[in-house]
């Protein structure tokens, strides 16, 4: 019974995925993921990226966000990216494969940043979802707290932070924490984000 339900759910997800207009557009354009469109919408609204910037990309694989940012920051810009999963190389992206929750991986990432002035930290990280909010939301909140800790460590004054967050327990407290660190904070739900998803994107600018 459980197997049948899981199979039916998987079939629905696959049908929705391949009929999704953003998935289809990503395939036509040769993009790595539909996430490219989410960041494009955010850039149109908030103008986060400029030529020559240094950007940290957390939860980077398969590379949709890094692929987008390369087009915005140009050849003089730099992206330091990290993910637990492997990612095919992108020109202009320094990729570190490892678990961001691991202290040694965090240290290695900070070493790659070095003395660079980071203008944007972005995080599209999400845990493997079990389908149980009581389990998934705390896991997701732990990841976004780590991303905010990275901002504290490397983000230059005036810098920006964009992070995927799942609405639920801890969201309001996290939003207040971000507002204490940045001068302007917006909560975005891009059109390319699936309506049924609890995900939103917090866009914070003007690191204090």
UniProtKB/Swiss-Prot annotation:
Belongs to the class I-like SAM-binding methyltransferase superfamily. RNA methyltransferase RlmE family. The keyword Cytoplasm applies. One of its GO terms (molecular function) is rRNA (uridine-2'-O-)-methyltransferase activity. Specifically methylates the uridine in position 2552 of 23S rRNA at the 2'-O position of the ribose in the fully assembled 50S ribosomal subunit. This is Ribosomal RNA large subunit methyltransferase E. It holds the Pfam family FtsJ. Coiled coil: none annotated. It is an enzyme of class 2 (transferase). HAMAP family: RNA_methyltr_E. It catalyses: uridine(2552) in 23S rRNA + S-adenosyl-L-methionine = 2'-O-methyluridine(2552) in 23S rRNA + S-adenosyl-L-homocysteine + H(+). It is found in: Cytoplasm. Its main location: cytoplasm. Keywords: Cytoplasm, Methyltransferase, rRNA processing, S-adenosyl-L-methionine, Transferase. The active site is at residue 164. One of its GO terms (cellular component) is cytoplasm. S-adenosyl-L-methionine binds at residues 63, 65, 83, 99, 124. Its EC number is 2.1.1.166. Gene3D superfamilies: Vaccinia Virus protein VP39.
